């Protein structure tokens, strides 16, 4: 994980590469990763991981020192290694060669060089990551929080928030913040889009639904386990059972003494949530003003 200052003062900024140019490179590379992953059949979490890896690499390395498409392909190859499907190297190399040769297949000798080059860059990425490939994603948490906090709008807000989570990988949000911060940020933006109350609103009604998860002095690990094991289908289908929350006894005093944001996650900080929301929203603002950039990305 990086902090915001490390992102702002990354090596590209130190070399006076303008922020808008850095964004152009990042958005184009992430779009290439997205398009290629769809063609070769990668799941959305593997696609997101590839974007996360490529963003990580160019926080530490100059854009001008590397072939960005090769880094994108190597990121896809590394992320696809966790899939149960067959090795994706050949499919990734084919997509690279089609772009490199303007729609034509590469000769066998050239194709072999492409394979070797992408494999070499994959090893470079692993070294940069210190052989640790992150596996935290916001998607499951979006499902859990949607069910708990929006039982009446569950499917609608989950669908929008998942789309926003996919788009969040065009930003550095997932390189800076834990998955619960990103998940809750996506829910805030989704609720704004759907024009329904957000968890930032003072009068947000469903915050007490989190009582279903909490117990006194719960640890972060226990909280995540409780989120994972709760029977959400039961809660969504039988909303009348939520009335039980109102009947809980004095033992709930512990929960009531927590701050609003501690009720959402034991160590959630409001500043992190707000900063993450703004970072993701900046991407959408850039897409609205994409004529300022020399590339095309559909929302």
Annotate each language-model stretch with its function:
Residues 1-299:
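Non-catalytic, interaction-prone regions of core transcription and DNA-replication machinery
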């Amino acid at each position: 994980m990086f902090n915001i200052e490390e992102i702002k003062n990354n090596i590209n900024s130190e070399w006076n590469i303008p922020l808008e140019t850095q964004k152009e490179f990042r958005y184009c590379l992430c779009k290439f990763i997205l398009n290629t992953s769809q063609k070769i059949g990668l799941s959305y979490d593997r696609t997101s991981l590839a974007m996360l890896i490529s963003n990580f690499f160019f926080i530490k390395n100059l854009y001008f020192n590397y072939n960005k498409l090769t880094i994108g392909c190597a990121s896809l190859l590394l992320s696809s290694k966790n899939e149960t499907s067959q090795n994706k190297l050949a499919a990734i190399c084919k997509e690279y060669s089609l772009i490199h040769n303007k729609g034509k297949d590469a000769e066998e000798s050239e194709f072999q060089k492409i394979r070797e080059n992408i494999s070499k860059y994959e090893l470079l990425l692993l070294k940069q990551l210190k052989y640790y490939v992150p596996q935290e994603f916001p998607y499951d948490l979006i499902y859990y929080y949607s069910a708990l906090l929006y039982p009446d709008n569950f499917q609608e807000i989950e669908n929008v928030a998942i789309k926003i989570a996919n788009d969040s990988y065009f930003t550095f949000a997932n390189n800076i913040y834990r998955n619960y911060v990103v998940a809750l940020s996506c829910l805030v933006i989704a609720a704004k889009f759907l024009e329904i109350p957000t968890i930032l609103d003072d009068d947000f009604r469903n915050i007490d639904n989190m009582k279903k998860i909490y117990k006194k002095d719960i640890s972060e690990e226990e909280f995540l386990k409780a989120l994972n094991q709760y029977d959400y289908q039961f809660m969504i289908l039988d909303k009348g059972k939520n009335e039980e929350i109102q009947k809980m006894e004095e033992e709930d005093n512990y929960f009531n003494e927590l701050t609003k944001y501690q009720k959402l996650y034991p160590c959630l900080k409001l500043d992190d949530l707000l900063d993450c929301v703004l970072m993701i929203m900046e991407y959408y603002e850039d897409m609205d003003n994409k004529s300022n950039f020399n590339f095309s990305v559909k929302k």
